[in-house]
Amino acid sequence: MKSRQEIKKQAKQMIAEDNLWLALGLPCLVLVLVNLAFAFNESATGVSSAISGLTLLYELCASLYVFDILTKQHLVGKQLGRKISDMFGSLTAHTFKTGLLVGFITGLWFFLPYIIGIGLIVAALVSNSFGILFWLGVALLLFGGFIGLIKTYEYALAIYLAKTNEELGLFALLKESKQKMKGHKLTLFVQNLSFFWWGLGVFATGGLLGLYVTPYVLAANTIFATEVLGINDSENPRKESDLEVF
């Protein structure tokens, strides 16, 4: 298992080859700019929800594309348009359904305790009481965030397992991911936390820095997944002679 520093170094090198960072980051930047364009338009409230959904779909496709490259299932094309096309082409019906299920289940863990907690807090405030009801609501808010985060990391491998195990059922994939992530959840959390300052940079630039940071983070997380899954092909650097010319 590579160290966090080795994984991040490999991720940087990978997205630098053939300007892969541009192919991965450009769709994300377009989504950010469209979202900003409608951010102050009250009549376009549904646009933000649509952009959020498209962003999740983009991240799913980008992660699978990086995974395909790492596992030698896909060679990197020369042209930008071909790279972007290949990225969205990495999505399969099985990985899409797996991604939906993961999103639904983790969403339930996050939002059900949150909604109930908010309800209890509002009820406590209306009744002008800061007793058990109020603190139970606060506890549910904290519980929802904590357990939702754990579930997010437990199912972090599900889409990659779906890519390589088309015969496995959706819940079997989640169970397998949960099993394989034992002992690795905190490591991945710390790795993601190490991008904190990059995240601030993205915020400070209105999302523009995400053109580079988003591919960097996605590549690092996908490399981490290949390490946990024991896919050693990710250790072999791609050679210019291996690339298809389009």
Segments (PLM) and residue ranges:
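Membrane-interface segments at transmembrane-helix boundaries
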Residues: 1-16, 53-115, 119-132, 155-185, ...
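Hydrophobic alpha-helical transmembrane segments in multi-pass membrane proteins
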Residues: 23-59, 98-127, 135-152, 188-218
